C-alpha cells in the first residue's frame, strides 16, 4: 500500500476523534497548544488518540522574553506577518512546563529541539536553541 493511501487527514475537533475512539500511530499538534484554553486537557486528548508506544509531536513557542520579542513584537507588530493579538505571551509554555504536562498525560518526551526561520532562504531549520520556537517528540506509555 502506498504511503499516501495510508495517510488520514480530516478537519475535525480533537474531542470528536477521542469520542469516536480513534487512535493513531502518530499524532501531531503543530503551533496549536498555545491557542487552547486548557493545555493539560488538550494533551490528555492527544494521548488518548495515540496508540501505546506511538509518537506524539508538538511544536509551540517558549514563554521567554526572546520569544515575546520575536513572536509577538516582531511577527505581529513590526513585520505584520500575523494579525495583532494572534498570540498571548501568558499562553506560551516553557519546555519544562510542556514536558510536565505531557508526562501527566502518559507521554514520555524523548527529544526536543528548537527551530529557527531563515528569512533569506525562507526555510525553517532545526536548532539546539529552544528559547523561541521548539518542537517536542514523545511516545505514549
What do the predicted segments below correspond to?
Residues 8-10, 110-113:
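General small-molecule cofactor/ligand-binding pocket signal
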Residues 60, 77-97:
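Acceptor-substrate binding/catalytic loop of class I
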Residues 63, 116-117:
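Short, solvent-exposed loop/turn segments at secondary-structure junctions
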Residues 1-68, 95-98, 136-140:
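Conserved SAM-binding loop
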Residues 89-112:
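Short alpha-helix
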Residues 66, 119-121:
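Generic structural signal for helix capping and beta-alpha/helix-loop junctions
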Residues 122-141:
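Core SAM-dependent methyltransferase catalytic element
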Residues 67-78:
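Short, flexible, mixed-charge acidic loops at enzyme active sites
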Amino acid at each position: 500500500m502506498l504511503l499516501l493511501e495510508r495517510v488520514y487527514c480530516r478537519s475535525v475537533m480533537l474531542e470528536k476523534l477521542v469520542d469516536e475512539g480513534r487512535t493513531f500511530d502518530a499524532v501531531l499538534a503543530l503551533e496549536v497548544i498555545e491557542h487552547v484554553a486548557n493545555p493539560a486537557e488538550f494533551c490528555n486528548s492527544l494521548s488518548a488518540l495515540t496508540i501505546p508506544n506511538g509518537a506524539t509531536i508538538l511544536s509551540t513557542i517558549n514563554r521567554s522574553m526572546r520569544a515575546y520579542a520575536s513572536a509577538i513584537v516582531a511577527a505581529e507588530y513590526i513585520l505584520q506577518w500575523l494579525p495583532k493579538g494572534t498570540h498571548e505571551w501568558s499562553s506560551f509554555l516553557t519546555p519544562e512546563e510542556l514536558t510536565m504536562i505531557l508526562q501527566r498525560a502518559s507521554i514520555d518526551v524523548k527529544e526536543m529541539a528548537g527551530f529557527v526561520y531563515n528569512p533569506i532562504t525562507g526555510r525553517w531549520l532545526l536548532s539546539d536553541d529552544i528559547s523561541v520556537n521548539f518542537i517536542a517528540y514523545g511516545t505514549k506509555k
